[in-house]
């Protein structure tokens, strides 16, 4: 799962940057490693996700579909983390109540 998450994170960053070198700088990963990850993801999905040119990359139709889904997933993760942080700030915890018999 972690491997797939990393591939989708790389895919998402390349799509946002619209070029591999920008994504490599943002992710602190070499350009060849980015290219290899994208190729691995494309191979596992059985489709081409990017059109490649000397000026950068652009999403294919399947790439656009995947981008929306990955973006939604990342937003859901972020929202979940924010909800957990709010929960923790509320001081939710264990409450003990003692009563005595009269």
Question: How should each PLM-predicted stretch be described?
Answer:
Residues 17, 26, 39-48, 81:
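Residue cluster at the C-terminal edge of the helix-turn-helix DNA-binding motif
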Residues 4-7, 31, 63, 70, ...:
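The N-cap/first-turn positions of alpha helices
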Residues 12-28:
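Short helix-boundary/capping micro-motifs
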Residues 44-45, 66-88:
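Alpha-helical linker/hinge and terminal dimerization helices associated
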Residues 85-102:
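Interdomain hinge and pocket-entrance segments immediately C-terminal to HTH DNA-binding domains
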Residues 7-14, 66:
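Short alpha-helical "packing" element that flanks the helix-turn-helix/winged-helix DNA-binding module
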Residues 42-64:
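A short LG(V/I)-centered, amphipathic sequence patch enriched
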């Amino acid at each position: 799962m972690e491997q797939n998450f990393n591939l989708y994170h790389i895919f998402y960053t390349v799509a946002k940057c619209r070029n591999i070198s920008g994504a490599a700088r943002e992710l602190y990963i070499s350009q060849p490693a980015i290219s290899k990850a994208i190729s691995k993801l494309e191979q596992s999905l059985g489709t081409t996700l990017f059109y490649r040119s000397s000026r950068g990359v652009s999403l294919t139709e399947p790439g656009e579909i995947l981008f929306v889904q990955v973006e939604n997933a990342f937003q859901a993760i972020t929202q979940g983390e924010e909800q957990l942080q709010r929960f923790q700030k509320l001081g939710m915890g264990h409450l003990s109540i003692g009563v005595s018999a009269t």
